[in-house]
UniProtKB/Swiss-Prot annotation:
GO cellular component term of the entry, any: cytoplasm
PANTHER family named among the record's database cross-references: ADENINE PHOSPHORIBOSYLTRANSFERASE
InterPro entries, per database record: Ade_phspho_trans, PRibTrfase_dom, PRTase-like, UPRTase/APRTase
Principal cellular location given in the protein's record: cytoplasm
Protein name according to UniProt: Adenine phosphoribosyltransferase
Organism: Azorhizobium caulinodans (strain ATCC 43989 / DSM 5975 / JCM 20966 / LMG 6465 / NBRC 14845 / NCIMB 13405 / ORS 571)
Family: Belongs to the purine/pyrimidine phosphoribosyltransferase family.
Upper taxonomic lineage: Bacteria, Pseudomonadati, Pseudomonadota, Alphaproteobacteria, Hyphomicrobiales
């Protein structure tokens, strides 16, 4: 068996994508490496091993992949947070800020019950607009947001600090400077 890789070295960096000056952090290489993916999930769930977490909420789309694995490890339910218009049942909706403008996300109104302990999961946190919207959405229906977990943090963009200012503990596995 080969040794476990340094997780940050498994993430592919694509310069100037999706626009010039951006260094895109592509986690598909990490997801495709069984050892790295397992280690990533293990590290994300470690602080809550043995804790009572009711649900894991994942943000569309890569948050579904990581969040599903985290929910499985914690024996918790999984809740998808999707772009508006993608869920078939009655939903609750929240607007959130994008770099240029805003959008809306939603979840099923009965996906989380008041007082349930929820961990929010996504692949990456940059400016924090989407994660902030997801936290507000979860709180709107009465969830107790225990933490937000991300594989990658881009600390220069301030998203993790934005969530901490909302009283949400943030767990990340790696960080990259720049955009």
């Amino acid at each position: 068996m080969s040794p476990l890789p340094d997780l940050a070295s498994v993430v592919r960096t694509i310069p100037d994508y999706p626009k010039p000056g951006v260094m895109f952090r592509d986690i598909t290489t990490l997801l495709g490496n069984p050892q790295a993916f397992r280690r990533t999930v293990d590290e994300l769930v470690q602080p809550w091993a043995g804790a009572k977490i009711d649900k894991v909420a994942g943000i569309e789309a890569r948050g579904f992949i990581v969040g599903g694995a985290v929910a499985h490890q914690l024996s918790a339910g999984f809740v998808p947070i999707r772009k508006k218009g993608k869920l078939p049942h009655q939903t609750v909706r929240m607007a959130y800020a994008l770099e240029y403008g805003q959008d809306e996300m939603e979840m099923h109104v009965d996906a989380v019950h008041p007082g349930e302990r929820v961990i929010l999961v996504d692949d990456l946190i940059a400016t924090g607009g989407t994660a902030e919207g997801a936290v507000k959405l979860l709180r709107q229906i009465g969830a107790q947001v225990e933490a937000a977990c991300f594989i990658v943090d881009l600390p220069d963009l301030g998203g993790a600090e934005k969530l901490r200012a909302m009283g949400v503990p943030v767990r990340t596995i790696m960080s990259f400077s720049g955009h």
